[in-house]
UniProtKB/Swiss-Prot annotation:
Intervals, Cytoplasmic compartment: 1-7, 103-124, 186-225
InterPro entries in the cross-refs: Claudin, Claudin_CS, PMP22/EMP/MP20/Claudin
The protein's name in its UniProt record: Claudin-17
Segments on the Extracellular face: 29-81, 146-164
Entry's family note: Belongs to the claudin family.
Function: Channel-forming tight junction protein with selectivity for anions, including chloride and hydrogencarbonate, and for solutes smaller than 9 Angstrom in diameter. In the kidney proximal tubule, may be involved in quantitative reabsorption of filtered anions. Does not affect water permeability.
One record GO biological process: cell adhesion
Compositional bias annotation for Polar residues: 215-225
Domain of life: Eukaryota
Amino acid sequence: MAFYPLQIAGLVLGFLGMVGTLATTLLPQWRVSAFIGSNIIVFERIWEGLWMNCVRQAKARLQCKFYSSMLALSPALEAARALMCVAVALSLIALIIGICGMKKIQCTGSNERAKAYLLGTSGVLFILTGIFVLIPVCWTANIIIRDFYNPAVHVGQKRELGAALFLGWASVAVLFIAGGLLCGFCCCNRKKQRDGYPAPRPSMPRTDERRRNMTRQSETPTSYV
């Protein structure tokens, strides 16, 4: 199977995208406190994530608290949780399928076509993972920016984009590249297999053979004794 380095690059990037997706899901720095106007309190930072909020004060340790009630969460936060959990599961499944489709792995024997289809499926799942990560990250960023410029929102309630959002965007880019590499490998492998088999030569019909034989016989001069 050709393009073996392409397989390695796609799976390595997919693994990095999976790690980035998991880190984005767990990190609390989705929304961080904004220091604007009269809210310049630099010795206290507030982080809000999908699962917990944290307060970090000067000369004090970081204190984090999980959200106590599921019913008290906003619909946007619940949807972001669900999408990120699905993204983590999809990335793990994509990585396992991609490993099974590797050249050196004998899960499918020596069937190159089956291995190519497995790698193509892995690439599609990595792209789907990127989409599932992109939706909550962009959604949350849109809410933060909208509230930041909304004069009706109190200054103390305004938030800025946290590091987890930037990590999520980077993970989406890596997942898209990984999926593109694996899908491209699958397409190239199918094209190579299709071009590798020569087209069968058309067989001459029997009627044409008989007609040619009759023509030759008629052209042969007849000798008379």
